[in-house]
């Protein structure tokens, strides 16, 4: 039976305390690698769906808005991100996630026989943890982390960390043995030990990471082309990396629990004009999946910090993010086929490591949109109508085709704000991102947010931390 750690739900507020079951993996007692793996998976999903992560990212990226001070009123809408939030997320990546994955790897290496597949599974999750951390903070501890002989790990450059992520994924791919039944299976909540799926995922995460790096380091295009030609990456919903929540108390999505804390009515997250308007312009069938109509049946978005509209009887006219997305058993989607397919479409449209091919890009683009709509429950007939009505990329200039691909990426990621924040920054050079955002009124910065500041706790505790945290408007290495 899979162990769902109740502590995963503690991240609903900015005052959450994580259980750190081992401070030093080199001195901790032996624990089943599968249990440690599952413990990390549960806490990771809880972090991603909890208030310390979901709220700052959804509000500051402006893929959602708060309806003004009488409704959500989130400080994060104006770029005030609590040090409790940054600290708790940092603790997950290092104390909970990274620390326990390293212990699981150590124990799998020392098992008899060595559990090579378990090591690979843990390395893939570790790679994704470090990818997420560096995409928030840039330079982070990596090469000297989780080493009991190093008290104060140095901060590695983002370029070094992302290359390290690629190395971890390559190591995992080399370790996977499809003929060996020994793997984390019972405790693998994602794929039940199916190493074919883990191999597919590792290739896809490698591709995604290269797509993040290639604008800053064009030499990565060759590796992108190699992966595209070889195939074997995430191609259907069956390959998705997804954490399944349930309707059972204690195993519900923390986003649902957040709404329960305010009486069970979703009035904290509203439709952003930056999201709803492009969807309406394209007659997107996901609109009723993403949003609730106003009391009069009309869908209306809001600007950042704009006050929600009501009628004379105080019924909401502005659209909130749908109850469907905040349901008890809403799954946490970490990586998926639509994200992969739209990235592949982009690669062909740009000619990254392959000949530019708008026809191939269009094929992948339409397939990605189909998968995105299907994931959110759009009826197949409505998907057909929508997709067949979209202009073909082959009729467009390369610039316009890329704009449409990036807009579909933006729309797809509305409820995945971390991925949204990454995608928006990589969608164009500063001032040319898709969509064009404006700095929120009353924001703590005169420029758009491009990163998080470091956890104050880490700044104080680690003498090798930067003396002063970079500001939220300062670009990361990958961000042009």
Where would I find each of the regions flagged by the language model?
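Bacterial Sec-dependent N-terminal signal peptides
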Residues: 1-23
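Long, intrinsically disordered, low-complexity segments
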Residues: 33, 255-281, 287-291, 300, ...
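Structured, solvent-exposed acidic/aromatic patches
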Residues: 31-34, 66-376, 395-402, 408
């Amino acid at each position: 039976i899979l162990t769902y750690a109740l502590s995963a739900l503690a991240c609903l507020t900015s005052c959450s305390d994580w259980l750190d079951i081992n401070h030093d993996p080199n001195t901790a007692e032996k624990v089943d690698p599968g249990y440690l793996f599952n413990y990390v998976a549960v806490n990771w999903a809880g972090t991603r769906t909890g208030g310390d992560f979901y709220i700052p990212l959804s509000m500051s990226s402006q893929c959602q808005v708060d309806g003004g001070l009488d409704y959500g009123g989130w400080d994060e809408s104006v770029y005030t991100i609590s040090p409790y939030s940054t600290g708790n997320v940092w603790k997950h990546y290092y104390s909970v996630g990274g620390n326990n994955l390293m212990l699981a790897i150590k124990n799998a290496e020392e098992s008899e026989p060595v559990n090579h597949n378990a090591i690979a599974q843990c390395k893939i999750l570790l790679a994704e943890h470090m990818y997420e951390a560096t995409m928030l903070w840039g330079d982070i501890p990596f090469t000297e982390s989780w080493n009991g002989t190093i008290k104060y790990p140095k901060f590695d450059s983002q370029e070094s960390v992302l290359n390290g992520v690629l190395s971890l994924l390559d190591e995992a791919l080399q370790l996977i043995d499809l003929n060996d039944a020994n793997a984390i299976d019972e405790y693998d909540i994602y794929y039940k030990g199916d190493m074919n799926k883990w191999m597919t995922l590792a290739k896809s995460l490698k591709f995604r990471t290269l797509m993040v790096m290639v604008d800053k380091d064009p030499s990565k295009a060759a590796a992108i082309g190699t992966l595209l030609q070889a195939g074997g990456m995430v191609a259907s919903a069956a390959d998705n990396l997804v954490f399944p929540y349930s309707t059972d108390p204690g195993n519900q999505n923390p986003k649902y629990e957040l709404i329960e804390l305010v009486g069970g009515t979703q009035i904290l997250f509203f439709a952003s004009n930056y999201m709803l308007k492009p969807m309406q312009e394209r007659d997107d069938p996901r609109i009723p999946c993403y949003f609730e109509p106003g009391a009069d049946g009309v869908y209306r978005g809001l600007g950042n910090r704009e006050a929600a509209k009501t009628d004379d009887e105080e019924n909401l006219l502005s659209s909130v993010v749908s109850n469907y997305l905040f349901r008890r058993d809403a799954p946490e989607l970490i990586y998926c086929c639509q994200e992969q397919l739209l990235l592949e479409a982009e690669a062909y449209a740009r000619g990254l490591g392959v000949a530019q091919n708008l026809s191939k890009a269009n094929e992948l683009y339409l397939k990605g949109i189909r998968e995105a709509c299907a994931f959110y429950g759009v009826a197949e007939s409505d998907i057909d109508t929508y997709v067949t009505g979209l202009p073909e990329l082959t009729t467009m200039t390369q610039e316009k085709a890329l704009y449409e691909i990036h807009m579909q990426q933006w729309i797809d990621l509305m409820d995945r704000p971390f991925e949204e924040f990454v995608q928006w920054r990589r969608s164009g050079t500063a001032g040319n991102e898709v969509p064009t955002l404006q700095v929120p009124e009353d924001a703590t910065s005169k420029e758009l947010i491009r990163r998080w500041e470091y956890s104050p706790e880490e700044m104080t505790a680690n003498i090798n931390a930067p003396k002063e945290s970079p500001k939220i408007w300062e670009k990361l290495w990958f961000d042009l």
